[in-house]
Amino acid sequence: MKLALVGDIGGTNARFALWENDQLHSVRVLATADFACPQEAIKLYLSDLDLALGAVGSVCLSVAGPVSGDEFRFTNNHWRLSRSGFCKDLQVDNLLLINDFSAMALGMTRLQPEDVRQVCPGIPDPTRPAVVIGPGTGLGVGTLLNLGEAQWMALPGEGGHVDLPMSNPREVQLWQHIYNEIGHVSAESILSGSGLPRVYRAICAVDGHTPVLDSDRAITAAALAGDPVALQVLEHFSCWLGRVAGNNVLTIGGRGGVYIVGGVIPRFADIFLASGFARSFADKGCMSDYLKGIPVWLVTAPYPGLIGAGVALQQAFG
């Protein structure tokens, strides 16, 4: 039987792995800037594993951008491909392109207990949708549906671009400063790596501090070292994420639970777990009891997008 190859293509890095027996192996990370197209990167990957062209029968790539038609242009790097040309060049039978956040959502179906940390307790209802939300370069939001008989459907959306919710005078003050800086304040403009400096500048402006930190990583490092202003930034970030996640649950009836993915939260996981996220998540007035029984997990698995690409391949081609 031919092997299957999966890839998770980002703006800077492309991750590749082989998918066999419901498992990943031989994960490699390559810089997209080093290659003119994905075929070149995959050829090097296969060569490093001493695999010839034609050894792989099916490929699934998790990509950013619309995936219809033969021609595909990556929105986060310089790569582009033709489906037919890709298959001919690499001697593969099948190429499946899947939205990157759909792959992330499908990856939730293979998580093990050690791949998550509990944020809010509860028992998921497997007959209801689950929310997948991911602060990273942007804010990804998707829905995961259990279709039964080991079949899953991931529905990507644009939930990261909803308006940022406010629930107290302090948040209104910060929102006003951010609005004066950037105009429309979407959830993504705050709940992303670039959002942390915006919240930091807003707190400094409102409270009369001189800003000295200029990046999300600097703010996170300062918070881990005990800086009180940086800690405020992470607290507001966590509470806003709770409100947005709770709103998504109410919108879709997401009693299947909430999975938090992406690269931002794991940098300050312990601070996040002690934050006001859970309180803000369930702070929905007459619907608070509805939210209190819904579990929330922080996903710590290193390659959920690759796993999701494997699940998509398995469902598409068996």
Across the structure, where does each feature detected by a protein language model lie?
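ATP-dependent carbohydrate kinase catalytic cores
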Residues: 94-125, 217-238, 243
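Glycine-rich phosphate-binding loop of actin/hexokinase-like ATP-binding domains
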Residues: 115-187, 269-270, 276-282, 286-288
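Short beta-strand-loop/turn "lid" adjacent to the catalytic site in phosphate-handling enzymes
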Residues: 50-97, 102-115, 132, 265-270
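Short glycine-aspartate micro-motif
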Residues: 4-8, 58-60, 96, 130-134, ...
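Short amphipathic alpha-helical segments
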Residues: 18-19, 43, 72-74, 109-110, ...
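Short, acidic Gly/Pro/Ser/Thr-rich loop/turn segments
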Residues: 14, 66-68, 138-142, 198, ...
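ATP-binding/phosphotransfer module of carbohydrate and carboxylate kinases, centering on a glycine-rich
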Residues: 1-49, 54, 172-318
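Active-site nucleophile and cofactor-binding loops and adjacent substrate-binding regions
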Residues: 32, 76-77, 96-103, 122-125, ...
